[in-house]
Amino acid sequence: KSGLEAPICLTWELTYACNLACRHCLSSSGRRNPAELSTEECFGVVDELQRLGVFYVNLGGGEPMLRRDFFDIVNYSTDHQVGVKFSTNGTYIDASAARRLASMDYLDIQVSIDGATEAVNDNVRGDGSFASARAAMDHLAAADFGAFKISVVAAP
């Protein structure tokens, strides 16, 4: 028998809640869905991913760090051999959050930024978003997080 018995990665829109209003948002994020999974239900999903042998989950949204239980879900996932990748606008990564993220195993972060300049980025993502994303990257670097990714949407 050859091949994989489970997907390598599963993408999970953890929340639709978002503090930005990006012009290009694919999920029409903004407000939290009232039917959003509870923490315990999220743990159940992770249990199933572990049972199936999924290598990692890509948490998106919305802004996944808006969930009050975000760190609980990430910890539960990595404690159950399900690695985590997540995309963030960076606004919730302060020095403390960066240190907490740097202390975790099996974690990959992608910070979204949409322009080489503040003017270009903020036109797409909203005022102050460029500075927030840059600050998040600085906090991650200062916390010795290691390599992280930067996601850029390019348009003509």
Report the location of each language-model feature.
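Canonical Radical SAM [4Fe-4S] cluster-binding loop centered on the CxxxCxxC motif
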Residues: 3-40
